[in-house]
Swiss-Prot record:
Enzyme class of the recorded protein, top EC level: ligase
Binding site for Mg(2+): 260
Source organism (scientific name): Gluconobacter oxydans (strain 621H) (Gluconobacter suboxydans)
Binding note for cofactor: Binds 2 magnesium ions per tetramer.
Protein name listed in UniProt: Phenylalanine--tRNA ligase alpha subunit
Taxonomic classification: Bacteria, Pseudomonadati, Pseudomonadota, Alphaproteobacteria, Acetobacterales
Catalytic activity, reaction form: tRNA(Phe) + L-phenylalanine + ATP = L-phenylalanyl-tRNA(Phe) + AMP + diphosphate + H(+)
Gene Ontology MF term list: ATP binding; magnesium ion binding; phenylalanine-tRNA ligase activity; tRNA binding
One term under GO cellular component: cytoplasm
Family: Belongs to the class-II aminoacyl-tRNA synthetase family. Phe-tRNA synthetase alpha subunit type 1 subfamily.
Listed PROSITE patterns: AA_TRNA_LIGASE_II
UniProt keyword annotations, A-Z: Aminoacyl-tRNA synthetase, ATP-binding, Cytoplasm, Ligase, Magnesium, Metal-binding, Nucleotide-binding, Protein biosynthesis
Gene3D superfamilies for this protein: Bira Bifunctional Protein, Domain 2
Length: 356
């Protein structure tokens, strides 16, 4: 009976030697060691033999099973290694070939302008404050000394939202980020030095206006703050932002409900060429003023002890002036060609201003 074991051994080893892939190898393994395999069938026949013969036959079958199991496992490892080497040869990469071009995104001009403004004011000691886009009328208007009859409160200029808040007031999409200034003065003790960039909303839409746009407002509250501090801060910002150390800057008397005195700020430019800092024309870029005493009082600050100044500017407007962008609506059209042209590399710093 040993002859049949030798035949099974030789046939199995020969089949393993000829196996070329995992499927052939697995068929041999199942056909030999599986539940219906040849060796398993011989083991099942042991019960029919006499005790002494069963003992000898069983020992021989166990030795054969161990031998074939080891041979099958070894051949399986060899087949896997051969398949790996074949795949590596077929997938060989020539590292001397040029890498495929990678299309990278760009930083949106609005995001980059906010980064630049944050860096410049950060070097002056300002921090960034944020607030909700949906405001109460008190934070958006009343606390800022804006009277009930002011045209900014009408639905022609402001988006009102239902339902009313817990005080019965209709909520609004903020028309300015000044509400952040109010929240900061209510929640923080002076001295305060913040800027508040963010989205604002007004019912207007044309080449130079959008129903949603971005503003950056600034606030300084401290003792003995004067108009000279305001002028020095804004002149420094504008000259660094436009990279014009001698940029002409002019302050004109104006009116805002929340500042007194109030001033519009103009920069020198050429109307004919659009050059910033050139020519004899003036271009308005932002509004500013000393914080109105009523605004300070509304926030629990004594106007006799604390003074301050505030300013606000349109982020899109500054981005358009600096980068030669002609139409405000282009900022929101998601045109990849426009973004590639006016966008900024993510690997370049926003500004070289010290303190970033």
């Amino acid at each position: 009976m040993a002859d049949d074991l030798d035949i099974l051994r030789n046939d199995t080893l020969a089949a393993l030697a000829g196996a070329q892939d995992r499927a052939q190898w697995d068929a041999i393994r199942v056909g030999t060691l599986g539940k219906s395999g040849a060796l398993t069938g011989l083991l099942k026949q042991l019960g029919r033999l006499e005790p002494q013969e069963r003992k000898e036959r069983g020992q021989a079958l166990n030795r054969l099973r161990d031998e074939l199991t080891a041979a099958i496992e070894a051949r399986g490892r060899d087949i896997e290694e051969e398949a790996l080497q074949a795949r590596l040869r077929s997938e060989r990469v020539d590292v001397t070939m040029p890498a495929p071009a990678v299309v990278t995104g760009t930083i949106h001009p609005i995001s980059r302008t906010i980064e630049e403004m944050t860096a410049i004011f950060g070097a002056m000691g300002f921090s960034v404050a944020e607030g909700p886009d949906i405001e109460s009328q008190w934070h958006n208007f009343s606390a800022l000394n804006t009277p009930e009859h002011h045209p900014a409160r009408t639905e022609h200029d402001t988006f009102y939202l239902p339902p009313k808040n817990e005080d019965g007031e209709p909520r609004v999409l903020r028309t300015q980020t000044s509400g952040v200034q109010i929240r900061t003065m209510l929640g923080s003790k002076p001295p305060i030095r913040i800027i508040a960039p963010g989205r604002t909303y007004r019912a207007d839409h044309d080449a130079t206006h959008s129903p949603m746009f971005h503003q950056c407002e600034g606030l300084v509250v401290d003792r003995n703050i004067t108009l000279g501090h305001l002028k020095g801060c804004l002149i420094e910002f504008l000259r660094v932002y436009f990279d014009k150390p001698n940029l002409p800057v002019r302050f004109r008397a104006s009116y805002f409900p929340f500042t007194e005195p109030s001033m519009e700020v103009d920069i020198g430019w050429s109307k004919a060429t659009g050059e910033i800092g050139g020519g004899s024309d003036w271009l308005e870029v932002l509004g500013s003023g000393m914080i109105h005493p009523r605004v300070l009082a509304n926030c629990g600050l004594d106007p006799a002890e604390w003074q301050g100044f505030a300013f606000g500017m349109g982020i899109e407007r500054l981005a358009m002036l600096k980068n030669g962008i002609p139409d405000l609506r282009s900022f929101y059209e998601s045109d990849l060609r426009w973004l590639r042209h006016y966008g900024f590399s993510a690997f370049l710093p926003a500004t070289l201003t010290e303190g970033v």
